[in-house]
């Protein structure tokens, strides 16, 4: 149940690759996740947008989809976004919104793990400077 609640709060559900956006209902059923009332299996791949040059984001997402994945999991690496206390950078290579929109264009869902700790062999676990 805890995992289900965590997923409910951290999943960003996107529509298909078409331009129109549709609201989805994601919930935990008795023995399965439900998307719009139908059983849904999360088939997720982990991608670290900070480790992939922005020019390759689309290709990597396509590769995940080709492997049968329907979801991309991402961490937010706070030590990249807040290199100086109180000053945040979500531009260019650090543009989480652009990465998520790109996943949406490929018909993928995204699970965002905001941290602050990152369990991905990352310096200081991704904690922002000054911690």
Q: Where do the language-model regions lie?
A:
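Aromatic-lined substrate-binding rim segments of carbohydrate-active enzymes
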Residues: 57-130
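Generic detector of short alpha-helix boundary/capping microenvironments
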Residues: 7-8, 25-26, 91
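Bacterial N-terminal signal peptides
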Residues: 4-14
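N-terminal carbohydrate-binding accessory modules
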Residues: 18-71, 101, 105, 109
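Short, intrinsically disordered, charge-balanced linker/junction segments flanking boundaries
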Residues: 14, 18, 129-131
